[in-house]
Amino acid sequence: MSCRVLLVEDELSLASIVRDALETQDFEVAIAADGAEGLHRYFDLRPDILVVDVMMPKMSGFEMVKSIRQSDRETPILFLTAKTTVDDVVTGFNLGANDYLKKPFAIPELVVRMKALLGHKTSQAKGTTIFTIGEFQFNPETAHLQHLSTEETTILPRREADILQRLCQHQGEIVPTQNILLDLWGNDDFFNARSLQVLITRLRGHLSHDPHIRIINVRGTGYKLLL
């Protein structure tokens, strides 16, 4: 069965090109021309994944995703954007984006990123390892990070969960930045490296209730989780 994609993009010529390319990959694509229409179509279609432009008339991609994430934390969302500042990336991830792709982009890279997000969504838990991180317990399959004393649970965005899983698997060791970028983004360009920095900062915030937990940056090499 084909995967349902909601593509929200106000450049209709670009949207048509992307739709045609995705349909050759067995995706079923619906197009919305702005955030307001995208929000309406989301509730009608309940797509398997959303690909959303940031800058649009009537309602921006940020506003649309903020509304969706009030009730849906699971459906993968990938932002398309010409906005490359760290603040923009932070805003997107804070709103619940799973990935970012900078315009202009190559269709094969978009397809790879979409399939990676969908693969996480549909994967089955088989012998999932539960990690204890100081005062926290982390289930990488469900992306649940639970504080053991308060039992407060945070559902991490998929990309943050993937990063934390790699750090937990190599606790006390350096996880090379390049490895994380290639595994999760497919390339190690500057834009993705800045996105990784943003997500590491967010993970530090999630874990800040235990002062003994540190994620350190080994300059020019990678990241290390210390307890």
Predicted segments, located by residue:
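Short, Lys/Arg-enriched segments at the junction into DNA-binding effector domains
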Residues: 4, 115-172, 178
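Active-site beta3 strand of CheY-like receiver
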Residues: 45-51
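Basic, amphipathic DNA-recognition helix from helix-turn-helix-like DNA-binding domains
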Residues: 66-132
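Receiver (REC) domain active-site loop signature in two-component systems and cognate sites
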Residues: 56
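Charged docking surfaces used in two-component/phosphorelay signaling
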Residues: 13-24
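DNA-recognition element of transcription regulators
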Residues: 106-119, 155-165, 190-209, 217-223
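Acidic catalytic/metal-coordinating carboxylates
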Residues: 34-37, 60-63
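Conserved acidic carboxylate
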Residues: 9
